Amino acid sequence: MSKLKVIPEKSLTNNSRIVGLLAQLEKINAEPSESDTARYVTSKILHLAQSQEKTRREMTAKGSTGMEILLSTLENTKDLQTTLNILSILVELVSAGGGRRVSFLVTKGGSQILLQLLMNASKESPPHEDLMVQIHSILAKIGPKDKKFGVKARINGALNITLNLVKQNLQNHRLVLPCLQLLRVYSANSVNSVSLGKNGVVELMFKIIGPFSKKNSSLIKVALDTLAALLKSKTNARRAVDRGYVQVLLTIYVDWHRHDNRHRNMLIRKGILQSLKSVTNIKLGRKAFIDANGMKILYNTSQECLAVRTLDPLVNTSSLIMRKCFPKNRLPLPTIKSSFHFQLPVIPVTGPVAQLYSLPPEVDDVVDESDDNDDIDVEAENETENEDDLDQNFKNDDIETDINKLKPQQEPGRTIEDLKMYEHLFPELVDDFQDYDLISKEPKPFVFEGKVRGPIVVPTAGEETSGNSGNLRKVVMKENISSKGDEGEKKSTFMDLAKEDIKDNDRTLQQQPGDQNRTISSVHGLNNDIVKALDRITLQNIPSQTAPGFTAEMKKDCSLPLTVLTCAKACPHMATCGNVLFEGRTVQLGKLCCTGVETEDDEDTESNSSVEQASVEVPDGPTLHDPDLYIEIVKNTKSVPEYSEVAYPDYFGHIPPPFKEPILERPYGVQRTKIAQDIERLIHQSDIIDRVVYDLDNPNYTIPEEGDILKFNSKFESGNLRKVIQIRKNEYDLILNSDINSNHYHQWFYFEVSGMRPGVAYRFNIINCEKSNSQFNYGMQPLMYSVQEALNARPWWIRMGTDICYYKNHFSRSSVAAGGQKGKSYYTITFTVNFPHKDDVCYFAYHYPYTYSTLQMHLQKLESAHNPQQIYFRKDVLCETLSGNSCPLVTITAMPESNYYEHICHFRNRPYVFLSARVHPGETNASWVMKGTLEYLMSNNPTAQSLRESYIFKIVPMLNPDGVINGNHRCSLSGEDLNRQWQSPSPDLHPTIYHAKGLLQYLAAVKRLPLVYCDYHGHSRKKNVFMYGCSIKETVWHTNDNATSCDVVEDTGYRTLPKILSHIAPAFCMSSCSFVVEKSKESTARVVVWREIGVQRSYTMESTLCGCDQGKYKGLQIGTRELEEMGAKFCVGLLRLKRLTSPLEYNLPSSLLDFENDLIESSCKVTSPTTYVLDEDEPRFLEEVDYSAESNDELDIELAENVGDYEPSAQEEVLSDSELSRTYLP
């Protein structure tokens, strides 16, 4: 026939035997003939199908009509043997061809024809056994590939046909086996499962699987798989519990465990566990499991299986069941609200903070009454879904699709009169520099030079200036902090002159429209390298006492702060020191061996000095750390708990260790071992000490005096530890404090431990974490700082801890804390530490701490050490925070060469770069990156000088001082994520955001839009450093609306800076960058500055908390050296960006340019389609233990108010403009 002649497959030829036989069979269908002929032809086809793969391939080849002919014959024939032959052919085709041939049969309508055949065959009395076996075998294979199969089977009445066959033929294993396989397929549909349950299928399965017998193991295996599928229905699970089948399953499991000595029946044992897993999805099932002593049974059997690796599936499934059935525990707290209270000046009308304040005092916010009442919803997928649907392309539902919302629309927001309050923060726009001591005393023609002739000193020390800045108060620092009187006096004069000119400068700005026009026309600036003379301040002028404290000279004086601090408590090794007055408060340096410094010998001193030189990459001068200055600054730092202690790491300072710290390899089985130890708490309750050893909520709490108990403390700046409970002799549960005016955001920790013994493995469990996953599961270690090591000239934070993992625990999270979601649990970070020194004082932190006082110290050192002839440096106060701390604003650029008009004009016309950091207090890495940026901008590197001559930098290095000071992770004292307040910041509740946005609005109003805005963040769920930007075209592209994206015309300049950084910064990863705009991020700084202010190059730069999986640092955990390097490389990238955007530069490297024809389609392949965490960021482990305690792999959408970043308006980790709790499957 003509259809058979047009065959595209090479192997299918017109003269092949199979083609002829199929043509003959088709003719029989068209022209009724004797059944003998049909039997003969189908038997021949069966013979070929059984013996030749070529025949099977030809019959299912694309374009072949063989399958249609067979199904047509099957549908029309009345002959039993012909039917059996065709069924046997179909069995051969689907058995050897894999999923493609099964799907091919489904697409040709095979399911419906076979179900109809089953219904017809069931009318025979008795039904033909061979026919039923064949039909059920084929349907069991093709059913999973037909997403409508469950509905089709139910409509055709196939469910009861199959079920009755099993009931009537329990001893006929040949017939029952395929029937059970098909029942398992039916049960994938929840409606079918309930229907079958009503007809006694659950009881029927238990007749087959018990009592214990090794006979017919294959039948038992299929019956158990079917039972597990059936018990996913809550109705069936309740029926099983009511009939006492949970005890039966446990008994059968123990029998198989005892008798299966050679582990040949592991699949049966796993099938029993799968059934238990299903039935314990309901509360009644969990109670029945506990009552039947299931916890102890599964614990003991799983421990006996640990020695055999092939039995790991049994151990893992047992662990899952036990975790699920473990009774939900209450966090041992009176309330989940922070231990510290700060009264807000204004209470928000709506939002989580408003809910917190409106909560009646009698309400228990720690747990819900119905916490364990709800069943775990794991009903089977409904019939409209199948596995293939999960393989669709990645689709981000949070992506913004409204083009009108995507288009940047500059909105003034505030009136020009209102914005004039920021004029005093921009003196560089109006200053004529008549009274400054510039390099050139005489005006001279403005010329371009290609080289910088004068070196610039490395800045190190500074003093914050005092005075009034409009209506914004500054912090007045003590003048005796200055390290060199002459320099301090000169600096004071310099800053005073600038302040005196503010009013005149304001008038100048209003009276010189010509200058403004010149400014507008020069937004991108000119590329000038002004001739410089030698610096007046040299490195030799900077006193060596400002070194960090571990050079040879500093070693001799290191005991100075210890001698002026008297010991308040006598102790042979450790002492509490105090007596430095804080204007009525006492500054305490915790516990320290007062003799430790004096016992250092000269050899150690020399080696320590060399170690420091080798490890600290500041070749041109001392570092920015000054312990005495730090103490003075802490006196003026205002905290809610009124901290009076200083943590030793902040006092001594940190230098990067001179060795690499690789990402930790996770040993196999760590997580299940930790989980087993947690389960032992329930099974062996007498072994649990359960003693409180630290408690912020109990002011009358006394520290236990026993010598073998660790002592804890976090009552210092940025500290966060609320409660510690000793569980076993060397194991402690730690509870973190909520952010102030909040009831969640537990992630950042920073605490002190003392009283340890060497050679003892101490286990620490932080038990109230909230994120669904963590880089602690992927090689990240906590940080530890040892005071003994610091005294031995090793003052650094190091990655520490073994047996680290992160998993869902049995402590219940109330709906109040989970944004209205019930039944959620907390997560545990667990790690084990062996301390090297006896009675040491050690500190642990989530990441490298960087306090507010540290920032103020660094800024003062930078200010006091810079050369005012070359570097224009101002440190103003942007505003005061809610608790009265100043928010610093830094301005850095190059001084004009002279006060000649052209030099001043060029100075004023430099484009702005606006940088900010640390809006999220727990992302301390952002501050280390900012430190690298600040140090580079103030360095004597010729590139840094070119950079200063190219831009004016406005920097807010810490947007959330209060959050940093008080140990918050995500919020300010307002209890809100400040990075979600940029659309409508409140001057009362979000002053730093309100005024930072005001600065940007002011620049927009005077037509001086920044060329770049970048907000530094940290990311807890991804590796490397990367950027998020904003692009209309890429956002539309990822909506899969290709037609719309083609219509969008957009300058691709937003890609230039990330691309430059991918070339020059070893930690930077372009493939992790994303330029999509998501709805949950519309109130972040990045999006608001892009959309409302109009800055095209508006970014968030995310730095990993863990390490890198690419580039130079692949396989290494990130440290402060790498973070500071990233900050410096960002500056270098800005200089290259300047050259690429400057009309005066030529010979540009083409590899760094973004051409318009660099299509989004190709670029999307090397960037991320979302800011959310993807599977490649958190891959599965070889150790397949689900992180959750439930049976379904939940895509944990943390905190309902958090979308995209766990926060009150979005959904992620309470990450950063970055991190998200939703894990989308690609």
Swiss-Prot record:
Segments forming domain Peptidase M14: 848-1138
- Phenotype when changing residue 851 to M: In CONDCA; decreased tubulin deglutamylation asshown by in vitro functional expression of the homologous murine variant
Q: What is the effect of changing residue 694 to D?
A: In CONDCA; decreased tubulin deglutamylation shown by in vitro functional expression of the homologous murine variant
MF terms (GO), sorted A to Z = metallocarboxypeptidase activity; tubulin binding; zinc ion binding
GO BP annotations listed: adult walking behavior; anterograde axonal transport of mitochondrion; C-terminal protein deglutamylation; central nervous system neuron development; cerebellar Purkinje cell differentiation; eye photoreceptor cell differentiation; mitochondrion organization; negative regulation of cell population proliferation
What are the protein's UniProt keywords? Carboxypeptidase, Cytoplasm, Disease variant, Hydrolase, Metal-binding, Metalloprotease, Mitochondrion, Neurodegeneration, Nucleus, Phosphoprotein, Protease, Zinc
Specify which residues bind Zn(2+) according to the UniProt entry for this protein: 920, 923, 1017
Note on how the cofactor is bound: Binds 1 zinc ion per subunit.
Q: What is its EC number?
A: 3.4.17.-, 3.4.17.24
- Which terms in the GO cellular component ontology are assigned? axon cytoplasm; centriolar satellite; ciliary basal body; cilium; cytoplasm; cytosol; microtubule cytoskeleton; mitochondrion
Q: Give all Phosphoserine modified positions.
A: 1168
Domain of life the protein comes from: Eukaryota
Protein location: Cytoplasm; Cytoplasm, Cytosol; Nucleus; Mitochondrion
This protein's cofactor list reads: Zn(2+)
The record, for PROSITE patterns, names:
PEPTIDASE_M14 (PS52035)
Impact noted for substituting residue 910 to C: In CONDCA; uncertain significance
Protein function: Metallocarboxypeptidase that mediates protein deglutamylation of tubulin and non-tubulin target proteins. Catalyzes the removal of polyglutamate side chains present on the gamma-carboxyl group of glutamate residues within the C-terminal tail of alpha- and beta-tubulin. Specifically cleaves tubulin long-side-chains, while it is not able to remove the branching point glutamate. Also catalyzes the removal of polyglutamate residues from the carboxy-terminus of alpha-tubulin as well as non-tubulin proteins such as MYLK.
Q: What disease is associated with this protein? A: Neurodegeneration, childhood-onset, with cerebellar atrophy: An autosomal recessive disorder characterized by early onset of progressive neurodegeneration affecting the central and peripheral nervous systems. Clinical features include global developmental delay, impaired intellectual development, poor or absent speech, and motor abnormalities. Brain imaging shows cerebellar atrophy. Death in childhood may occur.
Q: Which family does it belong to?
A: Belongs to the peptidase M14 family.
Protein name (database record): Cytosolic carboxypeptidase 1
Q: Which organism is it from?
A: Homo sapiens
Biological classification of the source: Eukaryota, Metazoa, Chordata, Craniata, Vertebrata
> What's the gene?
AGTPBP1
